[in-house]
Amino acid sequence: MRTYSPKPGDADRQWHIIDATDVVLGRLASHTATLLRGKHKPTFAPHMDMGDYVIIVNAEKVALTGAKLEKKRAYRHSGYPGGLKSQSYAELLETNPVRAVEKAVKGMLPKNSLAAQQLSKLKVYKGAEHPHTAQQPQTFEIGQVAQ
């Protein structure tokens, strides 16, 4: 029997919606990365993008454990000398919670050419509203929430 190798047309993409209310950021990111890569499917192939679309709502209500809210810092660089900027996750979640979730998910995707393609299937929204009701997303439950 020959080994099955999936073709690009074999990708059966579904839409999932995740409510980030009181979900720990790292746990949310790891489940999201698994869905984006397609590792939950029996047709997973590491060299192809077989993943699903993921919608994350209520990004502003995501939780961080311990003292990470004040001590963990998010960095970015302008490209100019002395252009390193940093801010705590408390400031980042207050100003741009979508960026905080995208940054966590991006860190859990592989560092190769497929990462940008997989990350483009991630849709993050600050509040509960999203424009993807026509795609009929299925609710994806994450078992543990922050206490």
Curated annotation (Swiss-Prot):
GO terms for biological process: negative regulation of translation; translation. Pfam families: Ribosomal_L13. The keyword Ribosomal protein applies. One of its GO terms (cellular component) is cytosolic large ribosomal subunit. The keyword Ribosomal protein applies. One of its GO terms (molecular function) is mRNA binding. Keywords: Ribonucleoprotein, Ribosomal protein. This protein is one of the early assembly proteins of the 50S ribosomal subunit, although it is not seen to bind rRNA by itself. It is important during the early stages of 50S assembly. Belongs to the universal ribosomal protein uL13 family. HAMAP family: Ribosomal_uL13. Part of the 50S ribosomal subunit. This is Large ribosomal subunit protein uL13.
